[in-house]
């Protein structure tokens, strides 16, 4: 008797896909429009790196005051392929807790991770800031783009950590509200 393999249904495939590829509890969805905007920014910017994970690491590095503060991030690291995982430089790991998440090479997925990482960093450093859930993804991404634009190719390695954090928080005031409001 020959045993035939049953084809997985679309629902089963989606569930399996969700379980193995993104942590749904810590990833925010972003619109295609915002993903395209961020892609355009990364492509046209003067940053030496075009790897969005490097940009997130750079933001976290400054937010953590060059590693002196601990920032807990639920999602930060992309694994380009299972065989060759992304290995951030040692300095970006200081004061951070990383959870590796295996994702595909889709711009939208990278944007989701960037939003989640930035959101968690802001929450960790500024507990009095609460997100407007209905607009968080797009605004977090706008915030990230604005923040990245402050780090030019010439000064990104010597950028003041305190200035970076102050700049990020001042930008966040436009997009986030505090619990006291």
Residue ranges and their predicted role:
Residues 44-78, 117, 121-162, 174-180:
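Short, basic amphipathic alpha-helical segments that act as recognition/interaction helices
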Residues 2-43, 77-119, 164-181:
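Short Lys/Arg-rich basic patches
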């Amino acid at each position: 008797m020959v045993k035939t393999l049953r084809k997985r249904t679309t629902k089963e495939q989606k569930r399996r896909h969700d379980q193995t590829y993104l942590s749904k509890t810590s990833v925010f969805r972003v619109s295609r429009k915002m993903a395209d905007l961020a892609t355009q920014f990364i492509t046209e910017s003067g940053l030496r790196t075009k790897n969005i994970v490097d940009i997130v690491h750079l933001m976290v590095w400054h937010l953590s005051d060059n590693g002196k503060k601990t920032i807990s991030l639920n999602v930060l690291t992309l694994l380009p392929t299972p065989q060759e995982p992304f290995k951030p430089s040692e300095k970006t790991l200081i004061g951070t807790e990383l959870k590796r998440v295996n994702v595909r090479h889709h711009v939208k997925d990278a944007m989701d991770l960037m939003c989640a990482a930035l959101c968690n960093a802001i929450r960790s450093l500024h507990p009095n800031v609460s997100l407007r859930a209905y607009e968080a993804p797009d605004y977090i991404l706008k915030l990230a783009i604005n923040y990245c634009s402050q780090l030019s190719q010439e000064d990104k390695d010597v950028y003041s950590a305190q200035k970076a954090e102050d700049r990020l928080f001042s930008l966040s005031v436009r997009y986030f509200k505090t619990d006291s409001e």
